[in-house]
Amino acid sequence: MNTKGRVTIPTDMDAVPETLDLLKRWGADAIRDCDGTEFPQELKDTGAKIYATYYTTRKDNAWAKANPDETQQCYIMTPFYTAADGALTIPLMTGISRELMKVNDHDDIARWWEVIDRTTGEPLDAAAWHYDAATESVVIDAPAAYHEYTVSFLAYLIWDPVHMYNSVINDWKGVEHQIPFDVRQPKTHAYTMKRLREYLESHPYVNVVRFTTFFHLFTLVFDELRREKYVDWYGYSASVSPYILEQFEKEVGYKFRPEFIIDQGYYNNQYRVPSKEYKDFQAFQRREVAGLMKEMTDIVHAYGKEAMMFLGDHWIGCEPFMPEFQQSGVDAIVGSVGNGSTLRLISDIPGVKYTEGRFLPYFFPDTFHEGGDPVREAKENWVTARRAILRKPIDRIGYGGYLKLACEFPEFLDYVESVCNEFRELYENIKGTTPYCVKTVAVLNSWGQQRAWGCHMVHHALYQKQNYSYAGVIEALSGAPFDVKFIGFDDIKADPKVLDGIDVLINVGDGDTAHTGGKVWEDPDISAAVKGFVHRGGGLIGVGEPGGHQYQGRYLQLSAPLGVEKETGFTLNYDKYNWDEHRDHFILADCPDHDVDFGEGKKSIFAWEGTEILIQRDKEVQMAAHEYGKGRGVYISGLPYSFVNNRVLYRAILWAAHDEADLHKWFSTNYNVEVHAYVKNGKYCVVNNTYEPQDTTVYTGDGSCFDLHLDTNEIKWYSIEG
């Protein structure tokens, strides 16, 4: 077995001996610095590839302070304020960290700010309000009594939010606040290209420039107590300035409004059905950002180095699943791996030479402290991500943070050594081939490919009570033997043939969100295309409130193919008699007690006559199966990630696709164990996803089977005979 390569480790000025030791122990072939660390010159000639973290928008306060007009900016909306009698005063910075932002009253506030009557939804004329700079407040002289008002305004980001986060989490003392500057603007643009060339001249030993990242940070706001106030890993509200917005107006031919970004205070988060204007803005940003990225990567290539992009931080506008990214010149992608979905978020990116996953835990004091258990976190991270790697591998793995902290935990060092060796073996066995896929599955939502593998993600891989029952579907798919695609409603509208070749469609989420479609179902072309796909023999799985939107006598617009509807009160007058359960169904055959954990589930779902209810609780349907024309629909109220739920989804997809007969092909009877086949490479593996020994019966591609015992987390490799 190869014991060297495909691993990147962090270093620091005071960690040279430790770095040299782990280069050998972990078989690492690349070294990197991190935020808050420096690269020691003693390691230049180790033979390892050297990554240098490069910040395009910060770590140069001399420039930032000399050019305050080109500091990065963000759109912010105040809370709602209710008018009574007389004038209404709205303070702008309430709930916002003054270390993080300051009001931009330098640019024309009448043009770039907006005061909105939230009771009517109408913006106020600029003459109806004025700004009091002394109190940093907007005053509405004659508001309508008991109407609610908000102010949307531009603010300068005077402390880079990521640097602020790192400073707060690590309790850094005496560290100068790094001010982010806007590379899109003329002076800083020219300076940035000069600065990059000078950096490359002075760092000839660097092999890979690890851009962290490019130009605009995702939306990250802190309050006065340095607490996280608002976060959206996909948020575009910090990618704005009058300079950028004037360019946008010229391109699209209509006037910009702050509301295009503010979106009633929801900031166009991925649960909101995106407006035309917001989609226009994103497309504009993608084109502009990709062009500027190409300038920088061309410079890097001219110096004979590789350009790597960190998937995160200042990555807004990069959008690696969209076509503009292919013109950016980026050689490699590295991203943080929190679970299987975030692994696929990296490994599925097309058009780069290689991808790398930065595994957890990060070597920071929040995990590496007395009483901390980094081994447990590392095990959970690796075993969770491994499912996805076995479907679509990244090319490299790595770690980040303070190496000396990790070295205080010898058991952690031992475990990571085993991970590195296992990854190399895994990669050698599956590289260059597509694993066996049982079916082609497409997740249908408003975002399509743009949010591939990131559906239902508010912050990077973090749990949310309101969405874990939906995110579990995406997580299950990340390591399942399916060819998974992501399709948008716009794709269907443009060409219904996009559904050709799909076996099963999945629509998952709450009603009137971007994930289920909302008002898009009022478009008869889209509604008919999806229902026609099922009626002609396709499969449909709806989770939560699929197609949820009140329209023309239905709440669930996919009610017909799924055979269920939600009781909103409008149909209480109708009696319902279909409540018999059919827990002996194919889908439930592997479930303990033929029951399922639906997570938060859904209230008030009932089934139409002719629908088979698999599980109902207190006369609320949790799972149902329905024949629709030549096709089939499956309704599930929620499906949090677990090994048994992986199996539930697997069987649901097979049943929806009329393919129950293919169950015993590359299959494990124990749902804690999975089988992955790489027919082109003549290999298959059986993997134990748990922390306990497991016994199973394994079925191969020809339907033959054998019994197998696996140790904790064990993976066994076999050759495909014949």
Where would I find each of the regions flagged by the language model?
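Noncatalytic N-terminal accessory/assembly modules of large enzymes
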Residues: 2-58, 62-97
